Amino acid sequence: CTYCMPKEHFDSNYKFLAKGQIISYEEIILIVKSMLPLGLSKVRITGGEPLLRKDICSLISMIRDLDENLDIAMTTNGVLLKNKVQTLKESGLDRVTVSLDSLDDDLFKEMTDSKFEVSRVLEGIKSAIDAGLKVKINSVIKRNKNENQINNLVKTSIEYNIPVRFIEFMDVGTTNSWKLDSVVTGKEIRDIIQREFGPLTKTKPNYYGEVAKQWKMARHDLDIGFIESISSPFCGSCTRARISSNGKLFTCLFSEQGYDLLSIIRMQADEHDLSVLISDIWNKRIDRYSEDRKEVKVISKPVEMSYIGG
């Protein structure tokens, strides 16, 4: 998408990672195993676009074999979902979140910088529901871009009987031309929804550290989430660690640099070594960028969203 991997920066001349620099499935599994004793309960596979990774279902199966109680999720643009959803389900995937910012084909193509039509994503969503996966829609809202899609996205979530989560446009990385003026706050989005669909009632989080603030639309018994890292940050309750495709551990979405686990693994570190290291890193983290945004000096080179997922 234009706010994640804009073509002017990630074009045919961009130097992507060489194969040897990419973390292998076996190395991912070692990291997951090392985090289980630390309280890991959920693994989300993101991107980039995870369904472009060769044999991604094998990774899901390997993670599932570690612990049958792990919650395994995936975030995808949905374009390839329809043809892979049955194998994903059989491999052990529990839930899928589909990114969808517009139901208007022209605007969808503009925001995703693609030639695909919305219908293909909707087919993927329906296929995932039919396969028995738990499904959510994620929608990033930008001012003067897709505010007019908010109520259409709510209507779609009603039609499919699945939650939709609205995300404030975030200042992740340096390539997405972020400006505070482009942010439509969660409150503004709720006001738009309530004018069309009636009152929303705030509900309790489903678990500690849930990033989306949950609201209930009584008229349709529908859950709507709002991820408000700009207007209402949640650093103090964040429980998410991120592993990049080159094996770095990031303790914050807005980090300038990560901790290189891959090099340590390739120096023969074992599961225990990693567990001790990750525990130490996590317990010493001081990331509060979203809460301190106004006071923080400019980060010289924050990590791009496409490196570590959402």
Task: Please describe what each predicted stretch is.
Residues 1-23:
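Canonical Radical SAM [4Fe-4S] cluster-binding loop centered on the CxxxCxxC motif
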Residues 4, 111-114, 264:
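Residue-level signal for well-ordered alpha-helical positions
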Residues 5-8, 100-102, 168, 253:
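Short, small-residue-rich loop/turn micro-motifs
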Residues 11-16, 104-112, 173-177, 260-261:
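A short acidic, helix-capping loop that chelates divalent metal ions and anchors anionic groups
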